């Protein structure tokens, strides 16, 4: 977008005036990249907790993939052009629901057509004065014409309200639903058709790149840096000239490069060497790919029998392209404290030999760990020389030439062409015994080829089952596995040895994805290991469970404790009170225009007579005026002419249906809040033996650090359980609609007009009251939920229990004091992270609430002081 480019340019421009020389040097170092950092395999310490566990970010929810302006635009289009978006409505709702919405849409079009065809009949007519009439008669005729004009204008406004209000309700429902489903932007096609479409796009993309590659003036060079640790090996390699290395006899067979239609992310697992096969020690190769360079860091594990063979295989790629090797290594990022590093260059169309075939064998006890990674390609977003410092993670070129070359495959041991898959970021680690990265040796060509054949068939059929891979990691990683990144969504693990994380933590201002990406890479980096490892003994605590009258002990995990609360809530009966309240409100709001029309017919145009008539006598007067006929009463309610009756009747039906849908949506939000409150209520019962027994829940005390961690995990999980963002959207929509209605009422009441009690003002008032009742319910439940999860009283009670245990068991004083200190820290952390309940982003500020209370009470005391004759004072109003 042009505006985006202008803002980015100006931001970069003004940033140059604040920079000093040291900052420019640091930024240049960042852009160059820190490629000399050694990477080692490690294991995350999942037994520790983060602040996200208390805040609730450990169990994240889906986030919208579209901006607010995009959602509003799509909501308008989906309502105005509803038949064209039939597939979307059917997918997001049901066919029956879409049919019902389509009928309402067609009735609205019919209503507008009838109104447009007959709208000329309700235009006020011009009354001419009689030529020979008196002045008094002319004034009387003028008054009559003014009254008729006012009557016609009121009828015109009533007809317009019957047309515009259903349209506004339909647009509001479309906007709410479009914002709810903004997290799901996938098209309505099936998985197979999307993959076929991706293959077609990949083929066209490859042809375009081939055309641009032919016309390219300068070729990019890749640098292969081979690092050797052993001093004798480095000395031997440095004493041999490059021509001798090229003519040396190589015993490593270079596999032919597979032809791939498009460099796509693949999940690859290196082949496991057979422990029974005699192996030859060889250097371990770790490949690190950046945007400008590709480094192959080779660390010698033991003295090599044929060190020159591996070097010859690496330099064979330069001989293949007809290019010469550099005479001296590149001097950037040189560390003189490290062994001698040998460099080799190769052109773009070539592939380093170490990426084709890696000569590495590990000891039998180190066999079993596999590293599978997917590295996506991103669109070029910056110009030449610009980078964000993350090129080593996301594979994005810092020189802006990603579209001009084909990046090297990321596979370590690739012997068969992988099928194109959807772009995503995923790293899967499958551990069995120990943790080293292994790959096939040169002597194990047959097992590797068998594994590649099986992986190729798996990739082509797209029927690889994730459950099989996860259940048998040792056998699953004996072959190269290529699968779609979206297939890993929803994978649950039962052990600590099987987990997956993302390569890059994506934020809101992160990099843009390619056009082939369907899933957000940031969503794969947020898997809660606390819930997904229920069988780990470290995450289980001792709980008390009541079997009728007997108390029994059991070791339960976070997931099992939370599931007990969820099952208990699900077993409770759902109250339908607010559903019925919404139905009543729908009929009430629909009958308001009819009620106002009947009141106008009954009272007539005489204002003095209308002020004298009591509203309790109106039903009797209306029945007398209709001559005790129901059809006459309906005629008075829906107009005189046939087309007016049609417009008002269709508007009545539309308003009833749409209002009912809207209040059902509000009832869904109320039920979700009630469910959250029940979760919070039962969560507070866990540490109380009496309440836990009454609620049939497990019971445990916070006398151990492990118990405190489990308690915090259950609290965080239950707070994120169920619909979150969608319900917040509904509540925010109700709040904003109420604000708009109150603003309209304020403007109407500020007018000095006799038309203060029109049906529009009355309808806006009733709408504000009905939606305000639901908002009051939301605020009440939200405050109760916050109070239950605050749990300060629970923590204080557990501290008292710890002191009681110290008195009873002095030998365990140190352990109990540690738990007491952790409880105090947990209480302080909960107070620090506590936020009040927010309604549409606006929190219930206690200071603002107290200020308003003081102002209202002060005004009330002033009025009462004047009425009663003595002064009233306000006492003990404190701001908490």
Swiss-Prot record:
Sequence ranges assigned to domain PHTF in this UniProt record: 4-185
A Pfam match: PHTF1-2_N
Subcellular location: Membrane
Residues of this chain annotated as glycosylated in UniProt: 132, 239, 431, 452
Modified residues (Phosphothreonine): 527
Phosphoserine found at: 517
Membrane spanning stretches: 68-88, 97-117, 156-176, 575-595, 646-666, 727-747, 756-776, 848-868
Principal place of residence: membrane
Composition bias, Low complexity: 265-274
Swiss-Prot/TrEMBL keywords: Glycoprotein, Membrane, Phosphoprotein, Transmembrane, Transmembrane helix
GO MF annotation list: channel activity
GO cellular component: endoplasmic reticulum membrane; membrane
Membrane topology listed for this record: Multi-pass membrane protein
Biological process (GO), any one: transmembrane transport
Biased composition range(s): Polar residues: 394-407, 449-459
Start and end residues of each stretch annotated as Disordered: 256-286, 357-412, 434-464
InterPro entries found in the cross-reference section: PHTF1/2, PHTF1/2_N
UniProt keyword Transmembrane, yes or no: yes
Name of the molecule in the record: Protein phtf
Organism of origin: Drosophila melanogaster (Fruit fly)
Lineage: Eukaryota, Metazoa, Ecdysozoa, Arthropoda, Hexapoda
Gene (name only): phtf
